[in-house]
A protein has these predicted regions:
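Short glycine/proline- and aromatic-enriched beta-strand/turn motifs that initiate or cap beta-hairpins
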Residues: 18-79, 201
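Short, flexible coil/linker segments at or flanking structured domains
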Residues: 8, 24, 31-35, 151, ...
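Bacterial N-terminal signal peptides
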Residues: 7-16
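Short connector loops at helix/strand junctions that flank enzyme active sites
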Residues: 56-60, 74-78, 90-96, 112-116
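Outer-membrane beta-barrel transmembrane domain signature
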Residues: 51, 83-92, 100-201
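Positively charged n-region of N-terminal signal peptides that target proteins for export
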Residues: 1-4
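Transmembrane beta-barrel strands of outer-membrane/channel proteins
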Residues: 34-40, 59-67, 77-79, 95-103, ...
């Protein structure tokens, strides 16, 4: 049954939206970048790169790693595609499937594997400054969450600005939690963050 639900989720994400030739959430298609951000309790690392075309439709891959002060860990991968849901100049809106593997410190150590969906938006505010606002949301339903967890919820909002050349400063807020079986919810992130992005090409 979970295999059937996995197939349905992927199909809805990739086929339910009208997909266009994709651009990465960076300045131009095909670019690659690495991010490093830190908050009071959480360190986050991310790699953004181009993905192989799917039926002629381009896309990008987003790999992330998160480590908390209490030594909880989450590794994630997203395959994102641009859509024309919101045909607004300077706005990119993407949807795609995501996979998370987490080690939580709730109660006894808990391992979680989740399949879900993500949506992300980026709006370019001032091109000459490299100033953009961004936000994203992720969700994994209970039927696709394995281990001692029910659901995954992940929300991020922030902004970036170019400091020099390929170097950008990032800042924002992230709220990320798992709902657990017979235990209180486990929030991995609920704080502001700041960091840098290095654009590789």
């Amino acid at each position: 049954m979970k295999i059937l639900w996995t197939t349905l989720v992927m199909s809805c994400v990739l086929l339910g939206a009208r997909l266009t030739e994709a651009q990465t959430p960076l300045a131009a298609p095909g670019e690659r970048a690495v991010d490093a951000t830190v908050g009071n309790d959480v360190l986050q690392l991310r790699y953004l790169g181009a993905a192989p075309p799917l039926n002629g439709v381009g896309g990008n891959l987003d790999f992330g790693a998160l480590l908390t002060e209490s030594r909880e860990f989450d590794a994630s991968a997203n395959w994102m595609f641009d859509t024309d849901f919101l045909p607004i100049s300077r706005l990119r809106f993407q949807v795609g499937p995501r996979v998370d593997l987490a080690w939580l410190a709730a109660g006894s150590k808990t391992n979680v594997f989740a399949l879900g969906v993500s949506a992300a938006a980026r709006y370019e505010l001032i091109h000459r400054l490299g100033l953009s606002a961004f936000g994203s949301a992720g969700y994994a339903p209970g039927v696709l969450t394995f281990g001692s967890a029910h659901n995954l919820y992940d929300f991020t909002a922030g902004a970036e600005i170019r400091l020099a050349g390929r170097l950008y400063a990032l800042g924002g807020y992230r709220w990320f939690k798992f709902t657990l079986v017979n235990e209180p919810d486990e929030r991995l992130v609920n704080e502001v963050f700041a960091g840098v992005r290095w654009q590789l090409e």
